[in-house]
Amino acid sequence: MKTLFFATTNENKINEVKNILDIPNLNLIVPQNFNIKETGKTFKENSLLKAKALFEILNNNQNVFGEDSGLCIEALNLEPGIYSKRYDTYKLCKKLSTNEKNQLILDLMKNEKNRKAYFICNISYISKNGQILNFEGIIKGKIALSLNDKKNYGFGYDSIFLTKNNKKLSDLTLEEKNKISHRGIAFLKFKKFLLKSLFNS
């Protein structure tokens, strides 16, 4: 049994990652009360920040990884970007619900013809011997004109992001989403690496 620590407390991310990293004899552990300020200026810096913090907490001798991801919109100068999770407080200095955050984006995009956007996911892995590796995934699409008004899957900005097939990410099941999403792409690369490095397969 191999052990791998994930530097997050985001339940939605945990569920997606567990679905992708479905490797026999891999024990994926998520720390409790893990809270690190994301002070990096890029997704890569933030994912490494989380991984390094957890690596130190675990006395520098466990395999760990951190992940940072977000939505980048061309017409908004690639915002919300690294502020995706906290775009409400960054933009309005107050907390909003997920639907309200999505509506904020739609309001900002109201008169924009260019609706191109992409989701990006960056993974930073630190092996127990201190080796650092990085994995990245991107899905390109566009911002929808309205919110989903039906019961849907997904979380965050999934309900306003249209894929190239003109489907919202929130219309896809977890399995369908993981086949094409930024997180799915990045973690599939990571999974291949883990199978080779930890399990020699």
UniProtKB/Swiss-Prot annotation:
Its cofactor is Mg(2+). One of its GO terms (cellular component) is cytosol. CDD domains: HAM1. It comes from the Bacteria. Substrate binds at T8, T9, N10, E11, N12, K13, S69, F155, G156, Y157, D158, K177, H182, R183. One of its GO terms (biological process) is purine nucleoside triphosphate catabolic process. It catalyses: XTP + H2O = XMP + diphosphate + H(+); dITP + H2O = dIMP + diphosphate + H(+); ITP + H2O = IMP + diphosphate + H(+). It is an enzyme of class 3 (hydrolase). Its EC number is 3.6.1.66. Keywords: Hydrolase, Magnesium, Metal-binding, Nucleotide metabolism, Nucleotide-binding. Mg(2+) binds at D68. It holds the Pfam family Ham1p_like. Pyrophosphatase that catalyzes the hydrolysis of nucleoside triphosphates to their monophosphate derivatives, with a high preference for the non-canonical purine nucleotides XTP (xanthosine triphosphate), dITP (deoxyinosine triphosphate) and ITP. Seems to function as a house-cleaning enzyme that removes non-canonical purine nucleotides from the nucleotide pool, thus preventing their incorporation into DNA/RNA and avoiding chromosomal lesions. Homodimer. PANTHER family: INOSINE TRIPHOSPHATE PYROPHOSPHATASE (PTHR11067:SF9), INOSINE TRIPHOSPHATE PYROPHOSPHATASE/HAM1 PROTEIN (PTHR11067). This is dITP/XTP pyrophosphatase. It comes from Borreliella burgdorferi (strain ATCC 35210 / DSM 4680 / CIP 102532 / B31).
